[in-house]
């Protein structure tokens, strides 16, 4: 609070800047290095979620940034607190998510002595953060926090790391608050849109690819109207399926792990690709084999909010520096040609998508994850948020789930294991009224599974589906491909995850047959508690189309 002389502690100034910039929620693990900041929260209307490990806190904040487009906020202590949180910072970097991580720091007079838990955060985070800094002068807090919000959200969004020396936080200073930040849009030029229309009019086999961040529900709706007018097939890139309604007749599917071969052929055979928001990195490009580098055979129009990515890998015939939200609005001014030579192909693309995703494949064992994911389509509301971490289990999720609205998919492009559980909790804290479900592998879950305690503490009834095949499945798959039959370090002995849930005060159930899943799911919903459904799946079921035995035998045969 302001004293009679108009001063506030630096910590109060800091938290007041968060209020000014519209922050309603922060995630943290407490530490003595920033106690003054914690105290400042006491008198301000910002909700705090206390987590059990800093990686969980950072991932929750990242998930909120991903869902809202505004910076997720995380506070952690110095040293090991910061290094634990680095996983979330890396996710924010590769997923283009706005995130601001505040880190406690040793007192200024102790720096460069390797004081207790001292680190140079500019050096530690310099390669994964958009900007890493340390505040020495409390009078500059409004300036630097404002810059952090603009940096995290501007251009290609990403993480900012700010170190807070503990002695600086208790200094008193008279300084005005900064104005509230307003996200800066990057609009395409009139000449860009004119050239795009000419290229579309000249095309015979165009396709649209959507990815990246800086989208909104309004932008997705505008893009859908554009696709309608031009009868364009639209695909989404890795873990960005929520950008286009899968029920839309123009939807052609998603480019990720184990994609539809017909979709890959359609992209390769296109004569024009309109790539909006994404980078078409290693995963959606199928290890950079989908397009020729540096000059694709197809006419490439690349729309991205940041010139540093335009031309970095692919030389586009038309490169447009624009945010997806601004570009989608500008699309309203484009008119289709009188004749659309590709019109008959778009329904075929959608039919290929439906044929690939409607009916789950048969897999070894009594639990078919594909049938479970497909069965949830009719049981989940359209605004349900579906989260997942990394592992082969996610191939079933991405293939058979239906993400009907923008913001209903939270999954890491970075491929970070342990993402799903904290992301689900963050989403539930952000929107308690929405259904939130997370899928996690057995190895995946135990990287951040302690955050289930956070869900119980805050009465956040997320439903976690743990897919237990008793191994690090993705690594085992590659191990069998390269070193068939030589199993090392990929087997797991797991606990009873249903009992684990009950031990924390949640709901837990074991599922050993597909038919038992949906009664257990309904019971979990009715319990009103955070829940874990423990699926015991056959380790032979590596993916919807590949078995462990077949993978090994193919490798042994030299295939």
Model-derived segments and spans:
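Phosphate/pyrophosphate-binding active-site segments
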Residues: 1-6, 139, 175, 297-392, ...
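Active-site diphosphate/adenylate-binding microenvironment
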Residues: 11-15, 21, 32, 37-38, ...
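Glycine-rich phosphate/diphosphate-binding loops that line cofactor/substrate pockets in enzymes
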Residues: 12-23, 63-69, 93, 151-156, ...
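Thiamine diphosphate
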Residues: 32-108, 111-112, 116-117, 262, 264, 269-282, 395-472, ...
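Glycine-rich, anion-gripping cofactor-binding loops and their flanking helix/strand elements
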Residues: 66, 212-301, 402-433, 446-450, ...
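Glycine-rich, acidic loop regions that bind phosphate or pyrophosphate groups
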Residues: 103-144, 166, 240-346
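Conformationally flexible catalytic loops at phosphate/diphosphate-handling active centers
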Residues: 147, 151-202, 337-339, 357
């Amino acid at each position: 609070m302001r004293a009679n002389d108009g001063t506030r502690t630096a910590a109060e100034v800091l938290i007041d800047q968060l209020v000014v910039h519209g922050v309603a929620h922060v995630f943290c693990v407490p530490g003595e290095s920033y106690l003054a900041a914690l105290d400042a929260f006491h008198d301000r209307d910002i909700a705090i979620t206390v987590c059990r490990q800093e990686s969980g806190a950072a991932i929750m904040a990242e998930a909120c940034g991903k869902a809202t487009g505004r910076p997720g906020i995380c506070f952690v202590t110095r040293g090991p607190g910061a290094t634990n949180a680095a996983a979330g910072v890396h996710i924010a970097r590769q997923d283009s998510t706005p995130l601001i991580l505040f880190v406690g720091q040793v007192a200024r007079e102790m720096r460069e002595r390797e004081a207790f838990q001292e680190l140079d955060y500019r050096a530690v985070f310099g390669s994964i953060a958009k900007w890493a800094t340390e505040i020495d002068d409390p009078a500059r807090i409004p300036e630097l926090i404002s810059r952090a919000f603009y940096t995290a959200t501007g251009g290609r969004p990403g993480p900012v790391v700010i170190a807070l020396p503990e002695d600086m936080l208790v200094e008193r200073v008279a300084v005005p608050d900064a104005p509230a930040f307003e996200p800066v849009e990057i609009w395409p030029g009139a000449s860009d849109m004119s050239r795009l229309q000419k290229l579309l009019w000249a095309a015979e086999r165009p396709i649209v690819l959507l990815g990246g961040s800086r989208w909104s529900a309004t932008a997705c709706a505008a893009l859908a109207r554009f696709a309608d007018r031009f009868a364009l097939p639209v695909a989404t890139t890795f873990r960005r399926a929520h950008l286009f309604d899968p029920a839309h007749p123009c939807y052609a599917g998603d480019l990720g792990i184990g994609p539809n071969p017909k979709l890959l052929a359609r992209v390769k055979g296109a004569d024009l690709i309109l790539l909006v928001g994404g980078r078409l990195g290693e995963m959606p490009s199928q290890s950079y084999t989908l397009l020729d580098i540096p000059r694709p055979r197809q006419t490439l129009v690349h729309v991205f909010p940041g010139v540093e990515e335009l031309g970095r890998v692919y030389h586009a015939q038309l490169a447009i520096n624009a945010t997806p939200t601004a570009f989608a609005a500008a699309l309203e001014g484009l008119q289709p040609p009188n004749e659309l030579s590709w019109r008959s192909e778009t329904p075929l693309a959608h039919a290929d998508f439906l044929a690939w995703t409607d009916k789950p494949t048969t897999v070894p064992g009594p639990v078919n994850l594909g049938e479970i994911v497909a069965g949830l389509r009719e049981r989940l509301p359209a605004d349900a948020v579906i989260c997942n971490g990394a592992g082969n289990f996610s191939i079933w999720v991405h293939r058979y789930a239906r993400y009907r609205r923008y913001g209903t998919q939270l999954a890491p492009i970075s491929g970070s294991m342990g993402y799903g559980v904290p992301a689900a909790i963050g989403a539930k804290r952000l929107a308690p009224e929405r259904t939130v479900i997370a899928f996690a592998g057995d190895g995946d879950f135990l990287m951040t599974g302690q955050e289930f305690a956070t869900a119980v503490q805050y009465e956040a009834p997320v439903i976690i589906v743990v897919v237990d095949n008793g191994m690090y499945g993705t690594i085992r798959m590659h191990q069998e491909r390269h070193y068939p039959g030589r199993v090392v370090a990929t087997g797991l002995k797991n606990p009873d995850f249903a009992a684990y849930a009950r031990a924390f005060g949640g709901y837990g159930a074991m599922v050993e047959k597909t038919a038992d899943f949906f009664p257990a799911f309904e019971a979990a919903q009715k319990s009103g508690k955070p829940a874990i459904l423990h699926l015991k799946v056959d380790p032979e079921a590596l993916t919807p189309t590949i078995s462990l035995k077949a993978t090994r035998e193919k490798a042994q045969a030299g295939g």
